[in-house]
Amino acid sequence: MKDKLHWLAMHGVIRGIAAIGIRRGDLQARLIADPAVATDPVPFYDEVRSHGALVRNRANYLTVDHRLAHDLLRSDDFRVVSFGENLPPPLRWLERRTRGDQLHPLREPSLLAVEPPDHTRYRKTVSAVFTSRAVSALRDLVEQTAINLLDRFAEQPGIVDVVGRYCSQLPIVVISEILGVPEHDRPRVLEFGELAAPSLDIGIPWRQYLRVQQGIRGFDCWLEGHLQQLRHAPGDDLMSQLIQIAESGDNETQLDETELRAIAGLVLVAGFETTVNLLGNGIRMLLDTPEHLATLRQHPELWPNTVEEILRLDSPVQLTARVACRDVEVAGVRIKRGEVVVIYLAAANRDPAVFPDPHRFDIERPNAGRHLAFSTGRHFCLGAALARAEGEVGLRTFFDRFPDVRAAGAGSRRDTRVLRGWSTLPVTLGPARSMVSP
């Protein structure tokens, strides 16, 4: 009963309100529940843009303007929104009284849901272990893992689902290395990551909600035991180092048990699904543009910029939100304290004022790196360098190994709104080129 009431407060009633709003043409309602927007959001980007830089909806504001999005993300007049904070008051009351004690990536004490001074403390602690040297070592791991995974493909030629067999397998190895997950537990962590992905959405169906809760609770229970194991037998993984710093450091780096669990959970949710989506989106885009693959074979130095363009054109994270800390004027509009602005990152990344011919995939686009796929300001993604490395190495290695790979069907998109990617992507591999391990 408690789960049902929580679903009604967080999702069920919102689904009903959104269905009515869609018939009335409300843009926010369409963003939440319109199947056409989930299938192909690009026309919706342009429709919202036609209404101006800042669009008023029934419940909040919405922007697709790159400059405004950039400024809002960096503004001290706005803060991050905790999951469910912008629900109508009666639903917010019910949601708070029926939620469980499991952690959520968009609720305190997650890095995504706190502001200074806690945010500064968390970020300083994580940065102490997530160094450029650590990222460099993980890049080597990505390359070797990619080669190992593709070796298995070469042994079983034919049609394969590249998302299930490659795009999801590569980041789970990296995440497991960060969290110190033993090999026998990695399939469970993969399952937790896949189940938790829709947890960022509002208005999800009841059955999907149950699967999400199963994933979050399962991960929470597993993580409690895993952290205890790392305390008793620490390894050379980043999570063991983080535990040591967090529990023996000064007041600026100390973390309690709940905060440690929140960071580990964020690594899973933010580091897994987004990278799966980056790889899947990139493979699909490059399969659809063989002329770009030909250019990359002649000019492999273009791979880093190609990844930036993939991030810009098909952003793994579609949107975020900020709430006004005080009454403030934005784009000529007076926003009251407590009002929310939904920032449509994916649409801002196609703003024609910043990116000429914004819907075109151009691997040589000179300003591709100006995208907001990793946000900006104090909440800029801590794992951006690693995500870029996984994208570049994962895509380059895949297409180098299978130069004749072709799409073998339409594939299917993930049923999520905040995150965007492929759930299946069948390909015909073709002959494999031999590769030498680094």
Swiss-Prot record:
Entry similarity comment: Belongs to the cytochrome P450 family.
PROSITE patterns (UniProt xref): CYTOCHROME_P450
Entry EC number(s): 1.14.-.-
SUPFAM superfamilies: Cytochrome P450
Name of the protein in its database record: Putative cytochrome P450 140
Record: residues binding heme: C381
GO biological process: cholesterol catabolic process
Coiled-coil ranges from the UniProt annotation: none
Keywords, ordered alphabetically: Heme, Iron, Metal-binding, Monooxygenase, Oxidoreductase
Record carries keyword Nucleus: no
Cofactors: heme
InterPro entries: Cyt_P450 (IPR001128), Cyt_P450_B (IPR002397), Cyt_P450_CS (IPR017972), Cyt_P450_sf (IPR036396)
Species name: Mycobacterium bovis (strain ATCC BAA-935 / AF2122/97)
